[in-house]
Design a protein with these regions (language model features):
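Histidine-acidic metal/acid-base catalytic patches
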Residues: 2-65, 138, 196-218, 222-312
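Active-site acidic/histidine proton-transfer and metal-coordination neighborhood
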Residues: 9-19, 27-33, 91, 112-215, ...
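Glycine-rich, proline-tolerant flexible connector loops at the mouths of alpha/beta enzymes
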Residues: 70-90, 146-150, 189-190
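Flexible loop residues that form catalytic
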Residues: 74, 147, 185, 249, ...
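Catalytic-core regions built around general acid/base machinery
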Residues: 84-91, 168-172, 233, 265-268
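Mid-chain, structured segments of secreted extracytoplasmic proteins
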Residues: 85-115
């Protein structure tokens, strides 16, 4: 073979190799995974690869194997956006996770923890709006953050006040079969002023409210920071948990980027839920560790890896 033919042959082989690699990468990027749990992304998770519309991102998530979704901002969206989300999710047979109904994670003024008729009436109005919003998107769960603690009041009085207001909220929700999930937020990295911080505290409050409409949102990221001991705390508060969220620590990115053994955590949730015929959504309330399409693929792979546990 002369030099010219040799070079041509080498170039052709390289081109075929590059084309094969490109084809393999494209096939990997379109793989639809079969997850054991209902992991729920949110708008923004896949926007680098599906940014044309809200429905575009929902369709992409569905095509990659995700069967649930959550949208904290649902009640703040326009009626047109809410309709688009609801219709697309119904068409794709995706389950709606949480949206935020009341409470600000950045609040500094107490609401639930003080006896204040004006503040409490605003909370109850928020709950009523949440009921209507849930009807529009076929949701069951809505996030409630009980706000800031009161520096001037004993913690036990604040707990009693919080329980009283939650009972009133529950009275509104119960006839509709809806559930507010209380989210404890960590005070060390993100929310130093929040009253509700730990899962045992949330468990105590939910037991006192004693309503199917008042349960716990166990955010693994927050609870790793506030108390750790994750699986034993999930086990201890299990009867009051209605919803989970994920995010690794430190950094609050996808599983595998921090210190939490998500494969074991997810296995515990899956196996116990299956044994008790329960069905949980795991909200992916975290950012992407990398930008662009590569970051989207890294998030998906993180859940593929964390979901790769043996079923008991």
């Amino acid at each position: 073979m002369n030099r010219r033919n040799l070079l041509a042959s080498a170039t052709g082989i390289a081109a075929v190799g590059a084309a094969t690699q490109s084809s393999t990468a494209q096939e990997a990027a379109m793989t639809k995974h079969e997850f054991k749990l209902k992991y729920a992304p949110h708008f923004g998770t896949f926007s680098p690869v599906a940014s044309k519309s809200l429905s575009d991102e929902l369709n992409y998530a569905h095509d990659r194997g995700f069967t649930a979704w959550e949208d904290n901002r649902f009640l703040l969206r326009t009626p047109e956006e809410q309709k688009e989300i609801a219709e697309t999710m119904e068409k794709l047979d995706m389950s709606m996770g949480v949206f935020v109904v009341t409470g600000s994670a950045g609040a500094t003024e107490p609401t639930f923890t003080v006896q204040n008729d004006d503040a409490w009436n605003l909370v109850l109005e928020d709950i009523k709006k949440g009921i209507e919003g849930a009807k529009r998107c076929n949701a069951t769960w809505m996030t409630v953050v009980p706000g800031a603690y009161d520096l001037k009041s004993d913690w036990n009085y604040q707990t009693a006040n919080c329980i009283e207001l939650l009972k009133r909220c529950s009275d509104l929700l119960e006839p509709h079969g809806l559930v507010m999930v209380l989210e404890p937020l960590n005070q060390h990295a993100n929310h130093p002023t929040m009253f509700l911080r730990e899962s045992p505290q949330a468990y105590q409050i939910c037991k006192a409210v004693d309503s199917p409409a008042c349960k716990i949102l166990f955010d693994v990221y927050h609870q790793q920071i506030t108390e750790g001991n994750l699986i034993p705390n999930i086990e201890a508060s299990w009867s009051e948990i209605a919803y989970f969220q994920a995010g690794d620590n430190p950094g609050r990115k996808e599983p595998g980027t921090g210190e939490i053994n998500y494969r074991n955590v997810f296995k515990y949730i899956h196996d116990r839920a299956k044994a008790e015929d329960l069905d949980f959504i795991i909200g992916m309330e975290h950012g992407n560790s990398m930008k662009g399409p590569e970051g989207c693929e890294a998030v998906i792979q993180a859940y593929v890896d964390a979901d790769n546990f043996e079923v008991s």
